[in-house]
Amino acid sequence: MLQSNEYFSGKVKSIGFTSSSTGRASVGVMAEGEYTFGTAEPEEMTVVSGALKVLLPGTVDWKVYTAGDVFNVPGHSEFHLQIAEPTSYLCRYL
């Protein structure tokens, strides 16, 4: 079953799903802006198109991830994003 989610006054939208190949995941699009997300469990983020400028927990330097790049976020933490253009992503819940 698909589950639609909307965050930050509609600037971030995602569709959650579960599949045998991916497990529990969501795909979504983020509009330009700055966002902070909290995690309940570890997440693996893959940039599908566009770019994410990310500040991960425990780091002081922002890093840019572009289409095809993957990064991991620990559970029970938060991470910060700066988005300069509409960007799509796949988030797998580990």
From Swiss-Prot:
Source organism superkingdom: Bacteria
Give me the segments passing through the membrane.
none
Q: What class of enzyme is it?
A: transferase
Please provide the record's keywords in A-Z order. Answer: Glycosyltransferase, Transferase
- Might you give the EC number(s) for this enzyme? 2.4.2.1, 2.4.2.2
Q: Which GO terms describe its molecular function?
A: guanosine phosphorylase activity; purine-nucleoside phosphorylase activity; thymidine phosphorylase activity; uridine phosphorylase activity
**Gene3D superfamilies under this entry?**
Jelly Rolls
Task: Give the signal peptide as a residue range, or say none if absent.
Answer: none
Q: Which reaction does it catalyse?
A: a purine D-ribonucleoside + phosphate = a purine nucleobase + alpha-D-ribose 1-phosphate; adenosine + phosphate = alpha-D-ribose 1-phosphate + adenine; cytidine + phosphate = cytosine + alpha-D-ribose 1-phosphate; guanosine + phosphate = alpha-D-ribose 1-phosphate + guanine
GO CC, sorted alphabetically, is: cytosol
Q: Which InterPro entries match?
A: Ppnp, RmlC-like_jellyroll, RmlC_Cupin_sf
Family affiliation: Belongs to the nucleoside phosphorylase PpnP family.
What is the stated purpose of this protein?
Catalyzes the phosphorolysis of diverse nucleosides, yielding D-ribose 1-phosphate and the respective free bases. Can use uridine, adenosine, guanosine, cytidine, thymidine, inosine and xanthosine as substrates. Also catalyzes the reverse reactions.
Q: What is this protein called?
A: Pyrimidine/purine nucleoside phosphorylase
Q: Which organism is it from?
A: Salmonella arizonae (strain ATCC BAA-731 / CDC346-86 / RSK2980)
The uppermost taxa in this organism's lineage are: Bacteria, Pseudomonadati, Pseudomonadota, Gammaproteobacteria, Enterobacterales
**Gene name, Swiss-Prot/TrEMBL:** ppnP
